[in-house]
Amino acid sequence: WFPKKKGLANGFTTMGHNCGSAFYVPLVSMMIATFGFANGLSYLAIGAIVLGIVGLLTIRSKPQECGLYPDNVTKEVYEREYFDGGKDENGGWTVVKLLKTKEMWLCALIIGINQLVTTGVMSQLVVRNTGLGFTQEAATGLMTVCALIGVVGSYLFGAIDQKFGVKKAILLFLAWYCVALAINCTDTTMGVYISVAMIGIAVGAAANFIVSLPASVFGRHGFTLVNSVFFPLMQIVLMTNYVVNAAALQITGSLRGAYFVYIGLLVVNMLITLCINPTKYNKDYAVEDQLKKG
C-alpha cells in the first residue's frame, strides 16, 4: 500500500505493536481476575477471532482493489513515477535466487541482530532493575513505561526513515541504542530512568525496520515471497539470543556485562548496515531515479 511512504506507515502501524506489549499482560491479568483462568482466556480468544474476521472483511491486499493507487497518489503520478510492468506475482524472484542474493542475508543479519539485542534487553530489564535496588513492582512498572514510550519511538523513527531513508534511520537507531545501554550500565538511579526512556524509543523503532528494510531493498514486487524467505532467516539470527545471552552472562558474570556485549553487537551491526544498498532491487525507486536523471 505504501511503497514510498513506508517509513511513516510503519511508524503508525507499529504503535499498536508497542501498545500490545504495554497492555496485554495487564489485560490478561484483569480478565483472569474477573472471569477466572479458563473463561478469561476464552473471552480473549473470542475477541481475537472476531478481530480476525473484521480484518478479513475489511482489509485489502492492494490499493487497486479499492480503486486507489499506492501511496494514495493519482493515476497520473502512479503511471509516471512507479513501476507497473510485468505480471509475475513474485517479481522475478525464486527462493533459490533470493538465497543467493547478498542483500537478503544482509537484511536478515541487520534485523536479526536488532531483534536479538531487543529481546535480550527486554527479557532482562525487570531482573536488571531489581538488581539495582528497585522493587519488583517498580521494575515491572518501568517495563510498562518502556513499552508505552515505544509508541513515540515508532513514530519518531518512522518519520526519520521517511525523511532520510531506512539506512540512515537504522544507523541512528543503533547509535541511540548503544548510548541507552551505556547509560544503563552506569548503575545509577538517574541512569536507569534515562535509559528506560531511551530503550523504550529504541524498542519502538526496532519494530519498524522488520518490514521497512526488506521492503526498501526489494520493493513491493514479489514482496510476499521475499518476506517468506527473509523472515525465517531473521528469526534464526534472533533465536541465537538465548545462546548469546547465556554466553555473555557466563563470560562477564553479570547482567551489566551482558549489556556491554549487546553494545558490541550493535556496533558490529553498524558496520554491516554500512554495506547494504537500501534500494538495490526496488523497481519503484529505479523509475524515480530515471526521472531525476532524465
PLM feature spans:
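Intracellular juxtamembrane helix-capping segments at the cytosolic ends
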Residues: W1-F2, N10, A205-F218
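C-terminal membrane-cytosol helix-exit motif in multi-pass small-molecule transporters
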Residues: I46-Y82, I272-N277
